[in-house]
Every structure is written in structure tokens, then in C-alpha cells.
Amino acid sequence: MRVKCVNRAIYVLTVLLFSRLVVSQVVLTPSNSNADPKQKDTANTVAAVEANNDANIAKKDAESDLVIGDHLVCNTKECYPIGFVPSTEWKEIRPGQRLPPGLDIRVSLEKGVREAKLPEPGSENIGNEEEDVKGLVLGAEGSTLSESELKETSEDLENEQSGFKLNNAEKESDILQQETDLKIAVSDNAEATSNEPAGHEFSEDFAKIKSLMQSPDEKTWEEVETLLDDLVEFAHDYKKGFKILSNEFELLEYLSFNDTLSIQIRELAARIIVSSLRNNPPSIDFVNEKYPQTTFKLCEHLSELQASQGSKLLIKRFLSILDVLLSRTEYVSIKDDVLWRLYQIEDPSSKIKILEIIAKFYNEKNEQVIDTVQQDMKTVQKWVNELTTIIQTPELDELHLRSFFHCISFIKTRFKNRVKIDSDFLNWLIDEIEVRNEKSKDDIYKRDVDQLEFDNQLAKSRHAVFGNPNAARLKERLFDDDDTLIADEL
């Protein structure tokens, strides 16, 4: 029992030394050369446990498949800020995050992660041992050593190991020296890092583009076009696309929107943006969060292209960017009046793309933005008319039919009687419900759960959305329990 108390006290003093460090990667062991070998072994065991935890954390970082940009760190599941935001409570340091200086940092032996928080007021007073010891967590069980237990354990330690005494003044001096050395090392490292240019594997290519733009002529723009053409190939890659976009989006946006440049250069820059965004959620989230005005800029430049009868290919690129950005957002808006004017262009593929954008904007996920924007109901009615017309086209595929139908239903539910639905659409809806009811009798058709779910929504919407809601409720009661329905209700 006494040996356990001795070991426990040694552990407390050792962890107390570790808690004063300002850099989480550095692990210090007691430097008292007068301590006997048994005491040193105990301290070394604690240091080994901490080192092992650091190794496990490093291993997790290596296996997390991180993509690190200037502002975000992304893995296959989520993105989070690259800068650690401290608070007064212990917070986990996420893989790849950068820490501001001056934080209290520890390794949680219970969780196996690094944690940091803002220093406590007056924590600079290293001699205040009682405050340092309070709340100190010991072992994986999370037990806490109280002041009375610490005093009792210290007395047992002095009786059992009379030869081992740690002088408070020497300890304070040792810790102060360690902190001074570490601050110097961190300062030197930060200075060295600040002198290194921030870069990525394509930074030389973009640096050359920027250099060529300083002295523009026909030859230099040809070189810029060649460089952009080479970069298009890499933009399709998940990781490389994010690196390009997170580091060079402003340059690519400038090249795309600059109407003084050739269509070839503008189109290539826009194509790099589209390729970096497509099927790349971290890239989409990065642009939406850091550059939320991009969708408005796209609408403005689309309006200019439409007014000047500009390149149809560039229009398609801008529409594709807008379409992808709207696929993962609840915080950006569009100018649907601009899109309506653009919709008048006689280009079937562009018309479909514009309707896809409208279907993404008028959606339940985007309701917060729609509530804050003054809607022109004349334009909204025009979109409803177009959607209800094109959805009746026999050649329209199932995916577009579902997307357009959900949009029509949302607009009708959201704006109610302010939007009118023509009888042709209602007749088509009745016929479509009957056709799908017949198909549902087929065993193979029944296997498609998503298809049956959509067919059910289609049937319910006939009265619940586009008709009389009371009739819908009556129909449900007839279907669920027609035996109990009284004659008056029929």
C-alpha cells in the first residue's frame, strides 16, 4: 500500500512538470540526477505512456486521409477550420489544426487525444502549486487526487523514501528554464516558417501565370493558356482539385470573369473551377463558406454574356459552376430573373441546366434563404409554368422528372394560392398516377423501394398539394378504415 502511495505521488509531481509545457510535442522527464533508479524508472514509464499516446495520435493523423488547405482541413467525412479556436474548457485538437501560441496543452490519457485551452488567469505564477494540483486527473479511471490525499501521500513518501526530496525552489527554476527554452524554440520555428513561401504542388505553375500576367502580350497569354490547359487534367482529381481551388480560387475567378481576356482563357479557368468542384464536397463547401457572393457574381456575368450574346460555351461553364455550388448549400442565393432572361436562349441543354438550378434553389433545404429574399412572384410563376410543361415531355428521364416535380410541389406548398397550376399539369398528374399504379403490380418494379416511395408521394400530392387537402384526408380514411366510415362522410 505504501509503495502504491509512493508511486502515486511521484506520478503527480511528474505530471505537474509536464502540465507547464507550452508545446504538446515535447515530453520532459524529471532531470533530478540525485533520484534513485526506481524513481527514475517510474518517471520514465509515465513519459513512455505519453510518448505512446503521441505516436497513436500521429498514426491516426496519417491514416485520416486529410486534405489541408489554407483555411480548412477536410477528410472523407467532414471539413473543419485549420485554425484551432481555444476556449476556457479543454477542447480536442483535431488532426492538422494549427495552434495559436500561449495555450495550455495536455495529452488526455483517458481519451488518447491532445487537448488545449486558454490559460487560467494567474497561471503564470508557477509557484502556486495548490492551484496546479487541484483537479489533476490521474490514470485512465479519471480519479482525482484531493489536497488532503496529496498531503497524506507526501508524508508517506518522505517516511518511505527519505532520500528523495524535491526542492520547490529548484523545481520552479527548472520549469522556468524549460519554458524559456521552449518559447525561444517556438519563436525561432515560427520565424523560420513565416519566411518560407506557402505552396502546394501546383504553386509554381500558378506563380508563373501570375508572373506572365505582369507583362501581358500575345505570346505571354498563349503561355498562360498552355499552363491552364495542363492544369485542367489535375483538377478532376479529388485531392488535387481541392488543393487547386483552396489555394488559387481568387486567381481562377479573376481569369474567368475578366471580359478583357480571350474566351479561351476564360473558358479554361472556368473549366478548372468546375472540374475541381464536381463530385468534391470539400471544394464546394470551401467556396460556399469563404466566397458566398460567387453565385451572385456568376449571375451578373451570365447577364452580361446574355446581353452581349457572348460565348455559349462560357455560359454553359458558368451555369455548371452555379449548379454545383447550389448542390450543397443553405446559405447562398441566385438571381432567378437573370436566369429567366438567359432561359430565352435557344439552347436545349442550357435550358435544362437552368431548370436544374431552379430546382435546387426552390428546395426545402434552401428555405431559410428563400424566406430572407424578396421573391418576384411573376418570375416564380414563369418557372412554375415552364416546369409543369417540360415535366409532361415523354422523353424526360425519371431523375429529372422527380427533381422538377419536387420543385413544383415545394413552390406550391410555399407560396400556396399565389401560384397557379394549370389544368394540363393536373390531368397529366392523374394519368401518371394511374400508369404507375399499373406498373406497381409488376414484381420487378416493386423491388425499387425509392421508385415506390416517389410514386406514393406523387399520388398523395394530387389532393394534399395540388387539390383539396380535405379530400386527401378523406381518401386516407377511406383507404385505412373504410368499414368505419359513416354514410354522411361519403
From Swiss-Prot:
Transmembrane segments: none annotated. The keyword Glycoprotein applies. Pfam families: SIL1. Interacts with KAR2. It comes from Kluyveromyces lactis (strain ATCC 8585 / CBS 2359 / DSM 70799 / NBRC 1267 / NRRL Y-1140 / WM37) (Yeast). Belongs to the SIL1 family. Its main location: endoplasmic reticulum. Keywords: Endoplasmic reticulum, Glycoprotein, Protein transport, Signal, Translocation, Transport. A motif (Prevents secretion from ER) lies at residues 487-490. InterPro entries: ARM-like (IPR011989), ARM-type_fold (IPR016024), Sil1_fungi (IPR031884). This is Nucleotide exchange factor SIL1. One of its GO terms (biological process) is protein transport. Glycans are attached at N258. One of its GO terms (cellular component) is endoplasmic reticulum lumen. Required for protein translocation and folding in the endoplasmic reticulum (ER). Functions as a nucleotide exchange factor for the ER lumenal chaperone KAR2. PROSITE patterns: ER_TARGET (PS00014). Residues 1-24 form the signal peptide. One of its GO terms (molecular function) is adenyl-nucleotide exchange factor activity. It is found in: Endoplasmic reticulum lumen.
